[in-house]
Amino acid sequence: ESGDHIRTYRLPKPDKVSNDLIDEKNENEFSLKWKTPGSWEEVQGHSMRLASFNVPSSEGIGDLSITTFSGVSGGIQANVNRWLGQIGLEPLSLVDIQKISFSRTGRLGDYQYFKLINEDQKETAILASIFQLEARTVFVKLSINANDIIKVESDFSSFCESISISG
């Protein structure tokens, strides 16, 4: 006898492990659907965005983004204050932010709506909606010239109201 022994081991196939991970990932995916206004053009966006749109206006093109993050993603105060900073305004307390927010309801549920305008810098204003869902937060943000806010606000509102979970 040479001392050689044959041993048999049963191991899971790598493909099976990979498929289990893929299936688990698919079960946890979160996808949305919406109704887009006819004049908006979907464009390739930043990798953090779920979707991006060019929103035409008389003063140029607005930039609309939809992003989603797990949890509260910094909360309303941190996000609104970041947006205020982007248009040259000072941060606000949570109490003051609540005074400038509007509560709305759409197909995805209740959300907070914001119209942020710096009267001294009208090149960029922001319309934004924050949907705080059970396990994640959805942000819809439109950066556009302040002179065009009134012209696009109805389409933005209808768009936000149309957002729902896909599937």
Segments (PLM) and residue ranges:
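N-terminal targeting sequences that direct proteins away from the cytosol to non-cytosolic compartments
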Residues: E1-G62, F69-Y113, N118-E123, L127, ...
